[in-house]
Amino acid sequence: VTFVENHDTEYRSASEQQDPIRKDTLAANAYLLAMPGTPCVFLKHWQKNKAAIKSMIEVRNMTGIHSQSMVYNMSNLYNLYAASVTGSDGKLLVAVGPNAAAYAPGSQWVKVLSGNKYAYFVENTINRPWVDLASGSYPNAQRVTLTAISDNSAAKLVYTTDGTTPTASSKQAGSGTTLDIPEGTTVLKVGLLIGNTVSNIITRNYT
């Protein structure tokens, strides 16, 4: 079991401060959720950063990271730590530190998430579509980014926003396309399009 904070270390009061994480909470969780083990997210971190942490969990699940996944260190500098982790379904690369946003690991890696001092990349051989905003309830309109994680340079994305299954004749988008999701209920479905074949459709439910 792995964790970055719990009730024994969290800040409680000025007279009972304990040993909390005082900054870079999301970067710490990004590292935790990319590494082997059985990660446990602190409830208060989840409540404060639900969408971001849920997306990290979805990347972990998509690549099949598990308790015995192999880790390969790619950078171990004072301002950047990066490692690739091999899951049962693909490889996830996590970068953390002040230089994480600028890290460019190579053409076989596709960036799928980024934030303050962290970034997630997935190896392109996984051949899957990706949407960076997790399913959930949001108080306002949102913007999502669609990404084609593929080693085929001709790969595109097809999508629907009414819950129907996308086909080769559905709306198409290139990797990196952004969509505006209106306030209210939207069921977004996205598939990877290579030639005339749509595969690995994913669903996001927004309310």
Task: Identify the residue ranges that each predicted region occupies.
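Carbohydrate-interacting/catalytic domains
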Residues: 1-132
